[in-house]
């Protein structure tokens, strides 16, 4: 029986940090990476969008993210799926914000019973790797079966299709 795969992602649009400075993007680095996963392994793709959008201005967005982490916030998500029960494998894609996953990722995961589901994280960043996100997610959702994640430099996401695709295929085998 073939695995039922869901790739979820949160990706920031607007001003984004790159090694050579702040740039304005219409498509975030994490969205690019999530699309590569979807292309490689199929299944369904779901973008996590908050009811109250994050600022498109880099510094304001950083302050919003820090405030959410500091208060353990769970921002409301738009258009949540009624159920994720058909899926046994879920790729969880996010940028490293304040050393962990954005709190909207937790908002999504809090909504569902993850018992026995295989969760596979992918984290975009500009040098901080996965940060504490893998540990934090495993601690918050211990009933899931967590697989080793992949750290992708955000500015290299667009040129990482082969690496991401091969990792995704290996992760579900």
Give the ranges of each region predicted by the language model:
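N-terminal beta1-alpha1-beta2 submodule of the flavodoxin-like/Rossmannoid cofactor-binding fold
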Residues: 1-89, 99-100, 162, 166-172
């Amino acid at each position: 029986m073939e695995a039922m795969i869901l790739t979820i992602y949160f990706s920031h649009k607007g001003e984004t940090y790159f090694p050579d400075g702040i740039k304005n993007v219409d498509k975030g680095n994490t969205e690019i990476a999530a699309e590569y996963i979807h292309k490689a392994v199929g299944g369904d793709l779901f973008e996590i969008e908050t009811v109250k959008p994050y600022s498109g201005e880099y510094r304001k967005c950083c302050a919003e993210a820090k405030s959410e982490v500091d208060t353990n916030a769970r921002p409301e998500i738009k258009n949540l799926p009624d159920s994720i029960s058909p899926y046994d494998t879920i790729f969880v894609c996010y940028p490293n914000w304040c050393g962990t996953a954005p709190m909207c990722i937790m908002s999504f995961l809090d909504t569902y019973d993850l018992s026995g589901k295989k969760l596979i994280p992918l984290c975009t960043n500009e040098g901080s790797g996965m940060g504490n996100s893998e540990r934090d997610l495993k601690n918050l959702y211990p009933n899931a079966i967590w697989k080793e994640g992949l750290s992708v430099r955000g500015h290299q996401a667009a040129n990482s299709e082969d690496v991401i695709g091969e990792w995704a295929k290996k992760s579900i085998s």
